[in-house]
Every structure is written in C-alpha cells, then in structure tokens.
Amino acid sequence: MRKIIIAGNWKMYKTQAESLDFLKALLPKIADDHEEREVVLCTPFTDLGLMSKSLHGTRVRLGAQNIHWADEGAFTGEISGSMLTEMGVRYVIVGHSERRQYFGETDETVNQRLKAAQRHGLTPILCVGESKAQRDAGETEAVIFAQLEQDLVDIDQNNLVVAYEPIWAIGTGDTCDATEANRVIGLIREKLTNKNVTIQYGGSVKPNNVDEIMAQPEIDGALVGGASLEAESFARLVNYV
C-alpha cells in the first residue's frame, strides 16, 4: 500500500512568529476524514524547535530541508541527523534542484545525505528532475534514470520517498501536464526495486490543479513550494477531492 504524502517546502520563508500564525490558521482547516494522508511541513532550521512543540498531538509531521552526511564535525553552516531527530523531525528533503543548482550538490553527495538520513531513522524525500533544456532535447528519462542510479546506491527503498520535480516547473507557474507527470513517475517506479515507494509530484502544484494531479494513478502526493506558504491554499491541497 502506497502512502499519500502532501509535503510543504517552505524554503527560506517564515520566521517563528509567522510559523505559529500559519499553524493556527491551518490546523482547523485540515479535514478529519482524510487522516490516511500524511501531511508534512519542511520548515527552515530556525523554526524546527518551535514547530516540533506546536505540532505535538496533531496529524502534521515535521520535516527539514537538508542534512549533512557526517554525524558531527567542522562543517560550518550544516546540520546533522542527530540534531534533526532531537527536534522531532521525521522527514528530510534531499537533492532538491535548488541545492543542486545553487550549492553544488552532486549525485555523490546526495547519496551520502540519503544514507545519513536513513542512518538516523529519518525518511528522506529524494528530489529528481530535468531542466527545460534537457526536456527540449528529449533527455528527460536519461537524466532522471542517471540520477536514480547514482543517488540510490546502497539505499533502503523501504524508507524512502521520491519526488519528481521538473526543474522548469518549479516556482515558474508552469505545471507539467498531469498525464505527462504520471507517465514520468510511472517510469521512475519501474526503475525502483520497491514498487510501493511513495512518489510525489513537485512543480507549481496549486489549488486549481491539485485535483487533476492527484487523480493520476502513479502519483502518490505532492511536494509543494509557494502554495504551502498560505494556510488556506495548503489546506486545499491536503483536502484535495
């Protein structure tokens, strides 16, 4: 049975005060009849402690946006798995395209971060996807398959979420056609040894397209950026029809 996971990635948004205001608005709007859907908020590191306390006893799980592969050490600006688990974090995003593009993360370091997450009992959300140039060149499958092959070396697929995020659709307002997203996610599933891995779609998921996206048979959830920053829009995604 594949788990449905709707995860918000707040990126570098929301102070602690803003996070509390968001939760106060969100929690009453999440329908109780959708308890089989896992709801995750991946917040900035500065929000994790407060959010952990505030989310206790709710159906929302706490996620982080990155993890270092070392358990400790002289790695200025990084955060370890034990630091995250101490905060009550359950999920962690690994290999987001913004990390790969702006901070030089490679498939090798993504693999190391995945291993660190699993070593500490965290469920990693592995992001894979192609650029506009790669899609236009007909390289979508080759790019994604290469990422999967390198990223998943010695990774336990029983504790893994994959997010297909076409880079050209992130924050642009351009959404990958739902049927095309379903096709690509189906190809990703074929490459996995565990066919029950939750595979999300990420890329301009909004209240006006979430129903069509989630109606696709291969899509098990969404990794949401901008639409997760407003309580009303994120609640609409969680409560998709």
Curated annotation (Swiss-Prot):
* Annotated disulfide bonds: none
Q: How does it assemble?
A: Homodimer.
Provide GO CC annotations from the record. cytosol
- Catalytic activity of the protein: D-glyceraldehyde 3-phosphate = dihydroxyacetone phosphate
| Signal sequence residues | none
HAMAP family, per the entry: TIM_B
Instruction: Family membership, please give it.
Output: Belongs to the triosephosphate isomerase family.
Could you cite one Gene Ontology molecular function of this protein?
A: triose-phosphate isomerase activity
InterPro entries, alphabetized: Aldolase_TIM, TIM_sf, TrioseP_Isoase_bac/euk, Triosephosphate_isomerase, Triosephosphate_isomerase_AS
Q: Which PROSITE patterns match?
A: TIM_1, TIM_2
The pathway that the record names for this protein is:
Carbohydrate biosynthesis; gluconeogenesis; Carbohydrate degradation; glycolysis; D-glyceraldehyde 3-phosphate from glycerone phosphate: step 1/1
Q: Which residues bind substrate?
A: 9-11, 171, 204, 225-226
* Function text: Involved in the gluconeogenesis. Catalyzes stereospecifically the conversion of dihydroxyacetone phosphate (DHAP) to D-glyceraldehyde-3-phosphate (G3P).
Keywords in alphabetical order = Cytoplasm, Gluconeogenesis, Glycolysis, Isomerase
Q: Which organism is it from?
A: Picosynechococcus sp. (strain ATCC 27264 / PCC 7002 / PR-6) (Agmenellum quadruplicatum)
Q: What is this protein called?
A: Triosephosphate isomerase
Reported EC number(s) for this entry are 5.3.1.1
This protein's record includes keyword Isomerase: yes
Active site per UniProt: 96 (electrophile), 165 (proton acceptor)
Q: Which GO terms describe its biological process?
A: gluconeogenesis; glyceraldehyde-3-phosphate biosynthetic process; glycerol catabolic process; glycolytic process
PANTHER family recorded: TRIOSEPHOSPHATE ISOMERASE (PTHR21139:SF42)
